[in-house]
Amino acid sequence: MAYTQTATSSALLETIRGNNTLVNDLAKRRLYDTAVDEFNARDRRPKVNFSKVVSEEQTLIATKAYPEFQITFYNTQNAVHSLAGGLRSLELEYLMMQIPYGSLTYDIGGNFASHLFKGRAYVHCCMPNLDVRDIMRHEGQKDSIELYLSRLERGNKHVPNFQKEAFDRYAEMPNEVVCHDTFQTCGHSQECYTGRVYAIALHSIYDIPADEFGAALLRKNVHVCYAAFHFSENLLLEDSHVNLDEINACFQRDGDRLTFSFASESTLNYSHSYSNILKYVCKTYFPASNREVYMKEFLVTRVNTWFCKFSRIDTFLLYKGVAHKGVDSEQFYKAMEDAWHYKKTLAMCNSERILLEDSSSVNYWFPKMRDMVIVPLFDISLETSKRTRKEVLVLKDFVYTVLNHIRTYQAKALTYSNVLSFVESIRSRVIINGVTARSEWDVDKSLLQSLSMTFFLHIKLAVLKDDLLISKFALGPKTVSQHVWDEISLAFGNAFPSIKERLINRKLIKITENALEIRVPDLYVTFHDRLVSEYKMSVDMPVLDIRKKMEETEEMYNALSELSVLKNSDKFDVDVFSQMCQSLEVDPMTAAKVIVAVMSNESGLTLTFEQPTEANVALALQDSEKASDGALVVTSRDVEEPSIKGSMARGELQLAGLSGDVPESSYTRSEEIESLEQFHMATASSLIHKQMCSIVYTGPLKVQQMKNFIDSLVASLSAAVSNLVKILKDTAAIDLETRQKFGVLDVASKRWLVKPSAKNHAWGVVETHARKYHVALLEHDEFGIITCDNWRRVAVSPESVVYSDMAKLRTLRRLLKDGEPHVSSAKVVLVDGVPGCGKTKEILSRVNFEEDLILVPGRQAAEMIRRRANASGIIVATKDNVRTVDSFLMNYGKGARCQFKRLFIDEGLMLHTGCVNFLVEMSLSDIAYVYGDTQQIPYINRVTGFPYPAHFAKLEVDEVETRRTTLRCPADVTHFLNQRYEGHVMCTSSEKKSVSQEMVSGAASINPVSKPLKGKILTFTQSDKEALLSRGYTDVHTVHEVQGETYADVSLVRLTPTPVSIIARDSPHVLVSLSRHTKSLKYYTVVMDPLVSIIRDLERVSSYLLDMYKVDAGTQXQLQVDSVFKNFNLFVATPKTGDISDMQFYYDKCLPGNSTLLNNYDAVTMKLTDISLNVKDCILDMSKSVAAPKDAKPTLIPMVRTAAEMPRQTGLLENLVAMIKRNFNSPELSGVVDIENTASLVVDKFFDSYLLKEKRKPNKNFSLFSRESLNRWIAKQEQVTIGQLADFDFVDLPAVDQYRHMIKAQPKQKLDLSIQTEYPALQTIVYHSKKINAIFGPLFSELTRQLLDSIDSSRFLFFTRKTPAQIEDFFGDLDSHVPMDVLELDVSKYDKSQNEFHCAVEYEIWRRLGLEDFLAEVWKQGHRKTTLKDYTAGIKTCLWYQRKSGDVTTFIGNTVIIASCLASMLPMEKLIKGAFCGDDSLLYFPKGCEYPDIQQAANLMWNFEAKLFKKQYGYFCGRYVIHHDRGCIVYYDPLKLISKLGAKHIKDWDHLEEFRRSLCNVAESLNNCAYYTQLDDAVGEVHKTAPPGSFVYKSLVKYLSDKVLFRSLFLDGSSC
């Protein structure tokens, strides 16, 4: 052991001494590698050739000053000021290094030849000829270019490639390369450039006035300007000559003229303004506009050249804190008292920020001046007695050392000689340990005598002042002043005989008869002080004139003093009062006196309230005998009508509206609307009606239909106005690039806060500065909408493009008599014809254009009829006898003819029945022919919440004629028509096979280049139409828009992969789409749907059978199971039998083909192959496109083959695909919805349907915020979550509209066959930070608890943390003897379909439960326009609304939305049982209940792609609910259980055991086999191919209950 320790110590000592050869070799190798790396790095620097002859010292100067370049000194060119000229090239390259390559750059006064030689084709040089020298310099640059080109030509060489673009640009467009205008007036255009713009100024800013520099940069949209200029700190002293030793140049100053020249050279001098240069040095901010400013920042000083940059700053982006709108009256009065003091100080304020205010900045940017002070030196001529003064920079430490020492001298020792001796001694040497080492202070020896005199004089005067302060007395016959002069004369001897006169002239002393006052001057000033004084002497400091403002403030102060006598005057809103006086141009004192008179009841006007609260104002302004000012009142009937002139004089305008019986107090007198101008500036509130659903119509059916039509117009207008008002209230400054269907114009800035997709809107809603809302008829000029001074914002929407509803209401109002419409006695004949039966042809053959009228719904159809009628060349069909319905209603009475003999209405069944009745009445005809198709698209009520009863949809006619022979449709389509119409449908077409379909791989594959479409292009939805138009297709329409049209060839396109309710086998839209063509129709779709099935069926019909159209329908029967026992479930233990093959067989029978998929490498394939994606606006960080590789750990291999996938690795592509297929794939199906009013009605139904009657009102004594609620929330959180809140101070709210985005690594298995044709997207999670959850989590937890406590739990189950046993108890009292309909609402894209309407419904529910208004508004804004950031994948995007899958209200919010949706559509008062959970629902209704069109209601109101299924057994949250005669049992879905057994993410055997236990818990009910037969029936309802499955249920129980046996379902992946 001792030997080992000795050997180790010896080796260590050898290593330390450097005798270890191995260590030495390693060290040398390491040193060599480091040197190689360093030299390689240096070799990569930009190369600069220095051709001018310079000395070795100058070579070292250039190399040290610019280490960024690899400089090669050739010394081949003699020139004047060689170093400065060579450095200029380095300075230019250094400036250009700061600019991104290729960005448009302005070189102010630059050398365009240098840029051409470097190949910079993106630089424009502004080279004005300010003097003769500039012309000479420019010609020299041109000569250098000619010389270069001649050399190339002489050597038969071409311009190098890197220079070619620049030289071509100079040859073709020299004005793009260089101009001779000043930078302020440069006319260079930037039309084709969209990036950031830069500028450089190399020794050229001297000639640009500093006050114009910022504006000039902004004019060119410059982002950053880099500048370089010569300067010296000594220029700020009183010296008139300053040397720049490094470049052998000098500055000479004469007043404001500053001259620059090179020493010992005959070159011309450069002359500039000293004060202008001083501004560039001292100022920090250079204003460019009232919003933007350029901020200067010094970069570096190199070889007497100063580098800086000017950055563009938008001051509107400064953080301004939280806006405070309240008014503190005490502070206002106090401010008024101090007004004159403020006036005095504000007048002296400087509007510029200069670096002089910060001494640390001065020291930093003038590093040589850090420890220097400026000391004055004096000299006097003996001949002329003229004093001269100059200043020098001296180290502060040197000055204090001298002063502190000589201050200790006794009076006899304080002589000039002693001071000079001491100064010379400390300047000459420093003694260290008795040895002379060096001089500590480097002070010029030529200054020592003058400095010594200054120090001596200062101390002498300071001593005299101290003595005079101690005592004032006379000494003998001489006064104190005489003694002082004696002392001074003795000190200076005869050298300065006139020192007394000099001191008096210098104002250092003040003498009277017997007294002497001495003012000791400052020995020195700091560099900072001199810089400040010099700048203020050279620059006129701006003064702020606030006299006018102070006068206005004085007037306002007097007015407020007048108002102070009012009661509660401290709550008076001063801001609103001031704005009112300014907008109305009213004197504040006059307005104040009027207000005092009104409030004191001295004006003749009596107000019924003491305080102007909202309730009191509403009470005072309620309708009595007069309408409010500007009101457009909706009335049900006329009363005694006064004259229209009197109504207009009062600013009233009444509109015939909801015609049903409602309380009479809701309405006022009704006037006739004579022109559209009466709508202008009517108050928006008068057009918004909230009682659409409580209407009772009276009279004959036709009269009721006509009243309903008028009311529908009012409801449509009300919804449009209401939504526009809501938009104005909700809109803040939104991203200007965002385009929406609606638009909001900011009047002050003339910019769209939200850009609308349409233009030239006819009307809109205006928000005034007084926050009032009015409907305005808009006018336009070349600049846009013409606005008024008191308008603040204008909102428009697609409904406001034309005057349609307004003009129709005006016309129909004139037709009413005593509030009742008149019904025509004309005969009405309905011509019911199949598609293509020749309805239009028949109309043209029967019509007499001279006395008849043709009306059609659309403009295209009207043009087609005119074109066909005038085909012979004789014009018979005009705009007077062939018109659209809208045109006829809007312009009634304006044409030449008002009465017609016969009326022909084409596609009349697409119109409101009341509209048809009005058309018959208005035409004054004897007979009316209404052509239509009872099976095609009927009238669709697009105003959600407005009642359109089913019996109103039936048109009352006198006679019905049928047309069952189609002249258009081919034979295969006729075969389909026979399934839809009564009677035999025949065709005349020779075409037999005309329809076909093509499945496309995705929406992105349909574009005009790769997929040109034949014939007319049709879509089912507006979103698909807009998508095709945006990709370049033309003449695209929806099926609804072309009803009644005929085309030879049709291409029908569906791009929406999610379910669309109107695409169904019995849908009228499908019928219309199949019957538009005469030759061919091809259907392009991205998914399988009913239309594909229809087309495939038609393709299989035999040609010889196409004339046989009979279809037999089978009878549906339902098996009834009688009851045996009651009250509890019969239990029969499940035998444990079966094998793995049983589970595999059952899975393959239910989902054939899924188990054969080899999808382990689908994710890899997607990453490695080319992929084309259509995305919405988002920001992608492409550095995250390749995920960091991770070691793949082996997982267990399942023996059961299912469609389960391997866990995927998150990354840019994977996350983006998930975002596209989920967040970016939201449907747009909803119609016109009056959001606020409809939401209020829906919530009324929610509370009436689900809540106990005694708990429908919120508990006011209930506190949402309490320690208990917070503790309950914390108890549910993990420890990691609590740790994230450690640094949260809860002082302010975090950004509630900011969300993070992530995906689940494991794809969700679908129990269908979609996995065989598509790559399933991962589930996305959009979530808040824990800080936000800590605020809103306890809040919504308490609200949820309060809601669940109020639910009628005997009838409704809100599935929140319920066990299967509790579900069984809930459904256990169902009586199987009572016939029931089991309903399930299946909603596709549930989260992503939720829009503004869903948010309004949910917020209204929370509000009624007691949510505080402020937090409710915060939560609302946090779910309106939101920003998503995925830091893992590098994705950032913006979403409007949508349900966030990770915030605190995700689950309960989805639950209340699905419950609200069903309550608004189904008769919940008849419901037996109902359960809701997220997007799942299960409802039990009595057999035979009538249900509305759920698909249409879900589409138009809720934007849901929904289907309502009637079943025998319920399916709820992955479980089958089996009700029987004893009660109810809940079975977990066995197919879902088998799918989970194919999981490929099990890590190890311990993970497998946890997996088994979780499956045992959810599948516990399978241990009871008593109701396996009913379970088979329930599974068979969902999966049609499922066999009886008791054998597989037993097998599942067998493997799940045995830990060892369950391990046999998996293999160890590490051993495979």
UniProtKB/Swiss-Prot annotation:
<dbReference type="Pfam" id="PF01660">
    <property type="entry name" value="Vmethyltransf"/>
</dbReference>
<dbReference type="InterPro" id="IPR043502">
    <property type="entry name" value="DNA/RNA_pol_sf"/>
</dbReference>
<keyword id="KW-0378">Hydrolase</keyword>
<keyword id="KW-0696">RNA-directed RNA polymerase</keyword>
<comment type="similarity">
    <text>Belongs to the ssRNA positive-strand viruses RNA-directed RNA polymerase family.</text>
</comment>
<dbReference type="Pfam" id="PF01443">
    <property type="entry name" value="Viral_helicase1"/>
</dbReference>
<feature type="binding site">
    <location>
        <begin position="833"/>
        <end position="840"/>
    </location>
    <ligand>
        <name>ATP</name>
    </ligand>
</feature>
<feature type="domain" description="RdRp catalytic">
    <location>
        <begin position="1380"/>
        <end position="1493"/>
    </location>
</feature>
<feature type="domain" description="(+)RNA virus helicase ATP-binding">
    <location>
        <begin position="801"/>
        <end position="963"/>
    </location>
</feature>
<dbReference type="GO" id="GO:0006396">
    <property type="term" value="P:RNA processing"/>
</dbReference>
<feature type="region of interest" description="Methyltransferase">
    <location>
        <begin position="50"/>
        <end position="441"/>
    </location>
</feature>
<keyword id="KW-1090">Inhibition of host innate immune response by virus</keyword>
<feature type="domain" description="(+)RNA virus helicase C-terminal">
    <location>
        <begin position="964"/>
        <end position="1116"/>
    </location>
</feature>
<dbReference type="GO" id="GO:0003723">
    <property type="term" value="F:RNA binding"/>
</dbReference>
<keyword id="KW-0899">Viral immunoevasion</keyword>
<keyword id="KW-0941">Suppressor of RNA silencing</keyword>
<dbReference type="GO" id="GO:0008174">
    <property type="term" value="F:mRNA methyltransferase activity"/>
</dbReference>
<dbReference type="Pfam" id="PF00978">
    <property type="entry name" value="RdRP_2"/>
</dbReference>
<keyword id="KW-0548">Nucleotidyltransferase</keyword>
<feature type="domain" description="Alphavirus-like MT">
    <location>
        <begin position="72"/>
        <end position="281"/>
    </location>
</feature>
<feature type="region of interest" description="Helicase">
    <location>
        <begin position="830"/>
        <end position="1085"/>
    </location>
</feature>
<dbReference type="GO" id="GO:0005524">
    <property type="term" value="F:ATP binding"/>
</dbReference>
<dbReference type="InterPro" id="IPR027351">
    <property type="entry name" value="(+)RNA_virus_helicase_core_dom"/>
</dbReference>
<keyword id="KW-0547">Nucleotide-binding</keyword>
<keyword id="KW-0067">ATP-binding</keyword>
<dbReference type="InterPro" id="IPR047310">
    <property type="entry name" value="Virgaviridae_RdRp"/>
</dbReference>
<dbReference type="GO" id="GO:0016556">
    <property type="term" value="P:mRNA modification"/>
</dbReference>
<dbReference type="GO" id="GO:0003724">
    <property type="term" value="F:RNA helicase activity"/>
</dbReference>
<dbReference type="GO" id="GO:0003968">
    <property type="term" value="F:RNA-directed RNA polymerase activity"/>
</dbReference>
<keyword id="KW-0693">Viral RNA replication</keyword>
<dbReference type="InterPro" id="IPR002588">
    <property type="entry name" value="Alphavirus-like_MT_dom"/>
</dbReference>
<dbReference type="InterPro" id="IPR001788">
    <property type="entry name" value="RNA-dep_RNA_pol_alsuvir"/>
</dbReference>
<keyword id="KW-0808">Transferase</keyword>
<dbReference type="GO" id="GO:0039694">
    <property type="term" value="P:viral RNA genome replication"/>
</dbReference>
<keyword id="KW-0347">Helicase</keyword>
<protein>
    <recommendedName>
        <fullName>Replicase large subunit</fullName>
        <ecNumber>2.1.1.-</ecNumber>
        <ecNumber>2.7.7.-</ecNumber>
        <ecNumber>2.7.7.48</ecNumber>
        <ecNumber>3.6.4.13</ecNumber>
    </recommendedName>
</protein>
<dbReference type="InterPro" id="IPR007094">
    <property type="entry name" value="RNA-dir_pol_PSvirus"/>
</dbReference>
<keyword id="KW-1159">RNA suppression of termination</keyword>
<comment type="subunit">
    <text>Heterodimer of a large and a small subunit.</text>
</comment>
<dbReference type="GO" id="GO:0052170">
    <property type="term" value="P:symbiont-mediated suppression of host innate immune response"/>
</dbReference>
<dbReference type="InterPro" id="IPR027417">
    <property type="entry name" value="P-loop_NTPase"/>
</dbReference>
<dbReference type="GO" id="GO:0006351">
    <property type="term" value="P:DNA-templated transcription"/>
</dbReference>
